[in-house]
Amino acid sequence: MTAAYYKTEMEFFVDMQRCIGCKACEAACAECETNGQQSMIHVNYVERAVTIQTTVQVCMHCDDPVCANVCPADAISKDEFGVVHTANTARCIGCSNCVMACPFGVPFKEEKYDMMMKCNMCYDRTSAGKKPMCATVCPSQALYYGTREEMRQMRPNSVPVNTFQFGKLEVKTKVNIMMPAGSTMLKVD
């Protein structure tokens, strides 16, 4: 894959504390011509004792993608920029191994096409030097595509974390979650 304009210093950041649940990201993602009018990002509402927390579910683009590792058809690939691409339509057999294996619960099987679909970080845009659609429309900047230095200046009390612990499994990702200063890892029980 050639991406003459892909900017390697750019990273994707998710700040759950800033998400207002407006779903502008979902609408923008669904409008992308590569998604078949499906959103590859999802806003979830988690009921708390007296409030509702919104969470954003997006592909984390793992350094060692479990979805690709369990694919018997070798349909899922990771490129030299760390982007884990959605299943190759000519190879995907629709087995759903990737759907069941992803620790973040991101890939889904599109029954209409009998294949796996997921976010590819708007590769058609990012490889041309543009931002992913979801990050361009987020009014609260809960989704941000930029440099670590920009993020440091914008959020001095937070740090980007891209290491997650699921039991004994440690997963490193291309996408960062903003956490309180001093955090180095997010443990998911």
Show which residues each predicted segment covers.
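Non-ligating segments of multi-cofactor redox enzymes
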Residues: 1-189
